[in-house]
């Protein structure tokens, strides 16, 4: 029993003599005093900060603040109050600016970053926090800085806090507005009062203001370093760090910029748009990168350049070998930054996004690209048209796309006239370049328009084509489809004796078993359904295009793999894309009544006029140029607008005097073709040889009439493509 009592007494004594809990405030103050005492006692000015205990003590102070916050809950703890009242952050900022001991600014930025990121309660709106943060921001981005990594981490922490609470941006940007007031969990007034006039034991024994820090520095012989940087502020610094050769630094700076602008509050957007140089600096940087692209670059390399995303620049293998060519690094950096601008504009509040897009329009598009597109040098036109085409491919933000359309096409909405084509100079020049004496410029500019037609902006198609077709003045009023079929057939018969012998190629319906014709020739089987008239019209339209090319000029059925089933598949895919593109554009389902205005001659517009002129010369033009012209026209034909469909795909419309349609233009080409091939012996065999060469089945060899024969093959393929487009535009339930 005595032994049991002794053990019990021992345990009781142990419980009563527990070690008392650590006083966090005392420990916090001790660490801070140890740091300040270093400046009083040290005599070695060359000793690096990493060889002192300052970094360790700063880490201990941070740990105490984090632990205290977890224990205190909503209320600010005594250590945080001490940090604020004694302006510790202000003092650290001054010590960091002096770079004493050497490397101190690095430690200060790390401490600031961790305070902002680890402390959960908002503190950035407090005067004794945001003022030193402002000063530390102005120490970032200095020339030849050795602290880029720490600067980027610090700015990322600041931007993260701004993203969480956009209101604090007013403090960070030093924008004074008496109407901007808010309550805080810690009293600013109490902190200011305590820092300005009160005296406490802690304050008396611990230097806490910037003046105290300067006093410490003067005792130790160190002096604050003046900043040689002209442009200060968070945004200029972030864009300065974007140029860093260190990938992580550049990446983090751009992520910070994205955090800064991606606010849902319009007030923040107004603030960044009107009170900061963000928009101008972005445009300047993009322009700078564009001008770094060498003028001797090969346009073919740019055309084949795939779309890049700005974050891929910071991956280990940022540029693929397939995209490596002389000047590729400059091209790559430019398009990465263009993608970043797209992302910033999309994420920003509307007012800021529009302002950024307009800055890019003014400085980059109009200030740099336009003069190059309007110059006389063919080499310059070719390079910059290709760069613009690739830029169109990269642009995906609605606001920037709107500015691009305004830049290229203008804002005219009235129907075009032949007398007023120069209302928008760049639009006129670009369309004229589609008919340039240089085939390369023509091909490149046609590619530019093809890229433009794939963008989700209704003004593009309206400006280029639809505004000239909306009144249907290309069509004689009061004419029926059946009468027009007879007229077109009569025109075909009169065109040539060959067409008279076989106007619609009845061999299409024979039992030869040609699999190439199966998909479209299955259509007559559905004429017995509930809507036979619709099917009859579609079948007639499809066969009208299929039968345009005379039999002796057809070769697709003679070479395996040249059928039009592929065209049907491709047309269906493109039609789905175009339908999705225009879903919200509220296009009419059917064409409206013809407006009869005999005093006004129909003009298809500058763009279609050039395209029709080009297709009329298909037998005389280079193969690559023909491919591009037909590609643009087939893209236009796919769009589900009733007027556009009627004008490009209906063979039976009764055209008004002087008007031409795509089908009537092709009929004239066929008439020219019939005359030309009469003088060529074994024309079908020659065409088969050329077709096999184009398909890569045979090696290339010189053949007489090469341009003409290639033109015939493109013509046949184009007619098959238009037939496929007409077929896939049938309602799904009717196919």
UniProtKB/Swiss-Prot annotation:
It comes from the Eukaryota. Residues 183-229 are annotated as: Disordered. InterPro entries: FHIP (IPR019384), FHIP_C (IPR045669), FHIP_KELAA_motif (IPR045668). Pfam families: DUF5917 (PF19314), KELAA (PF19311), RAI16-like (PF10257). Residues 196-221 have a biased composition (Low complexity). Belongs to the FHIP family. This is FHF complex subunit HOOK-interacting protein 2B.
């Amino acid at each position: 029993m005595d032994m049991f009592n002794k053990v019990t007494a021992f345990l009781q004594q142990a419980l009563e003599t527990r070690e008392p809990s650590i006083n966090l405030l005392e420990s916090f103050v001790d660490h801070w005093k140890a740091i300040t005492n270093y400046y009083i006692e040290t005599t070695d000015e060359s000793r690096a900060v990493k060889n002192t205990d300052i970094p360790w003590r700063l880490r201990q102070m941070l740990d105490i603040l984090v632990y205290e916050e977890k224990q205190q809950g909503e209320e600010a703890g005594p250590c945080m109050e001490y940090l604020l009242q004694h302006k510790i952050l202000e003092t650290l900022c001054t010590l960091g600016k002096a770079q004493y001991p050497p490397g101190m600014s690095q430690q200060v930025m790390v401490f600031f970053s961790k305070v902002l990121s680890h402390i959960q309660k908002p503190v950035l709106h407090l005067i004794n926090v945001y003022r030193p943060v402002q000063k530390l921001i102005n120490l970032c981005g200095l020339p030849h800085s050795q602290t880029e990594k720490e600067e980027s981490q610090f700015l990322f922490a600041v931007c993260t806090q701004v993203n969480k609470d956009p209101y604090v941006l007013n403090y960070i940007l030093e924008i004074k507005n008496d109407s901007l007031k808010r309550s805080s969990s810690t009293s600013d007034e109490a902190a200011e009062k305590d820092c300005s006039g009160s005296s406490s034991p802690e304050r008396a024994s611990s230097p806490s203001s910037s003046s105290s820090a300067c006093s410490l520095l003067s005792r130790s012989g160190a002096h604050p370093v003046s900043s040689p940087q002209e442009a200060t502020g968070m945004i200029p610094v972030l864009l300065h760090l974007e140029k860093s050769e260190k990938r992580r630094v550049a990446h983090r700076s751009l992520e910070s910029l994205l955090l800064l602008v991606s606010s849902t509050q319009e007030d923040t957007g107004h603030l960044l748009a009107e009170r900061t140089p963000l928009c101008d600096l972005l445009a300047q940087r993009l322009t700078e990168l564009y001008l770094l692209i060498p003028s001797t670059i090969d346009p073919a390399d740019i055309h084949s350049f795939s779309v890049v995303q700005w974050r891929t620049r910071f991956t280990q293998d940022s540029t693929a070998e397939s995209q490596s060519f002389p000047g590729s690094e400059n091209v790559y950096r430019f398009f990465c930054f263009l993608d970043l601008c797209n992302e910033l504009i999309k994420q920003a509040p509307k007012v800021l996004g529009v302002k950024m897009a307009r800055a890019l329009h003014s400085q980059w598009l109009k200030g740099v690209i336009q003069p190059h597109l309007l110059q006389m040098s063919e080499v310059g036109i070719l390079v910059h048209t290709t760069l613009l085409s690739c830029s169109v491919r990269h642009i995906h933000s609605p606001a920037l796309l709107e500015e691009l359309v305004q830049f290229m096409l203008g804002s005219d909405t009235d129907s075009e006239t032949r007398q007023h084509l120069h209302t928008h100079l760049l639009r006129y020049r670009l369309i004229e370049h589609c008919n340039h004496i240089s085939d390369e410029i023509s091909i490149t500019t046609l590619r530019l328009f093809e890229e433009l037609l794939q963008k989700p902006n209704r003004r593009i198609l309206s400006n280029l084509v639809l505004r000239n077709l909306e009144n249907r003045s290309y069509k004689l009023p009061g004419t029926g489809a059946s009468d027009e079929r007879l007229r077109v057939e009569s025109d075909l018969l009169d065109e040539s004796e060959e067409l008279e012998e076989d106007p619609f190629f009845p061999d299409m319906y024979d039992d030869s078993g040609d699999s190439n014709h199966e998909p479209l020739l299955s259509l007559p089987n559905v004429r017995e359904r509930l809507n036979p008239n619709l099917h009859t019209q579609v079948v007639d339209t499809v066969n009208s295009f299929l039968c345009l090319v005379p039999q002796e000029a057809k070769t697709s059925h003679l070479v395996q793999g040249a059928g039009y089933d592929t065209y049907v598949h491709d047309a269906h895919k493109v039609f789905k894309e175009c339908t999705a593109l225009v879903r919200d554009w509220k296009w009419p389902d059917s064409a409206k009544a013809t407006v009869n205005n005999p005093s006004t001659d129909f003009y298809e517009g500058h763009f279609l006029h050039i395209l029709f002129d080009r297709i009329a010369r298909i037998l005389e033009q280079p193969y690559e140029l023909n491919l591009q012209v037909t590609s643009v026209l087939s893209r236009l034909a796919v769009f589900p607008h009733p007027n556009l469909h009627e004008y490009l795909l209906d063979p039976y419309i009764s055209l008004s005097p002087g008007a031409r349609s795509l089908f009537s233009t092709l009929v004239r080409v066929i008439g020219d073709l019939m005359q030309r091939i009469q003088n060529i012996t074994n024309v079908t065999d020659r065409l088969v040889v050329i077709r096999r060469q184009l398909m890569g089945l045979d090696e290339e060899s010189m053949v007489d009439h090469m341009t003409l024969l290639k033109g015939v093959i493109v013509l046949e393929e184009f007619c098959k493509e238009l037939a496929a487009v007409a077929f896939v535009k049938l309602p799904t339930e009717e196919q």
